[in-house]
Amino acid sequence: MARIAGIDLPRDKRVEIALTYIYGIGLTRAQNILAKTGVNPDIRVKDLEDGDVQKLRAATESFTIEGDLRRQEGMALKRLQDIGCLRGRRHRMSLPVRGQRTRTNARTRRGSRKTVAGRKK
């Protein structure tokens, strides 16, 4: 089983798709990595040779992925909250950050409805 950046890639998937299981690598970046390393994107992970896995591992080390990327994003959110800007306050209150309306809708961000007594008209 191929293990890259601490993630076990699914054996029966194509390499191009399996690389997207790594946090921080999407389809476009996976295609770029495969083009740079010269690995066939249509081959299955179980059919990869050790040399190919080493090439992929070396190519992914140049990117910020997995734990480092999660930590970096978390620190960016924490910085916004610490400086007290509008985006940081909206993140802290679990409200939409980018100017969407909240009188109605915004259910994904705000969570399920909380019934308030006496709100019936």
From Swiss-Prot:
GO terms for biological process: translation. The keyword Zinc does not apply. InterPro entries: Rbsml_uS13_C (IPR027437), Ribosomal_uS13 (IPR001892), Ribosomal_uS13-like_H2TH (IPR010979), Ribosomal_uS13_bac-type (IPR019980), Ribosomal_uS13_CS (IPR018269). Keywords: Ribonucleoprotein, Ribosomal protein, RNA-binding, rRNA-binding, tRNA-binding. It comes from the Bacteria. GO terms for molecular function: rRNA binding; structural constituent of ribosome; tRNA binding. Residues 100-121 have a biased composition (Basic residues). The keyword Ribonucleoprotein applies. It holds the Pfam family Ribosomal_S13. Residues 91-121 are annotated as: Disordered. Transmembrane segments: none annotated. Disulfide bonds: none annotated. Gene3D superfamilies: 1.10.8.50, 30s ribosomal protein s13, domain 2. One of its GO terms (cellular component) is cytosol. SUPFAM superfamilies: S13-like H2TH domain. Belongs to the universal ribosomal protein uS13 family. Part of the 30S ribosomal subunit. Forms a loose heterodimer with protein S19. Forms two bridges to the 50S subunit in the 70S ribosome. Located at the top of the head of the 30S subunit, it contacts several helices of the 16S rRNA. In the 70S ribosome it contacts the 23S rRNA (bridge B1a) and protein L5 of the 50S subunit (bridge B1b), connecting the 2 subunits; these bridges are implicated in subunit movement. Contacts the tRNAs in the A and P-sites. This is Small ribosomal subunit protein uS13. It comes from Prochlorococcus marinus (strain SARG / CCMP1375 / SS120).
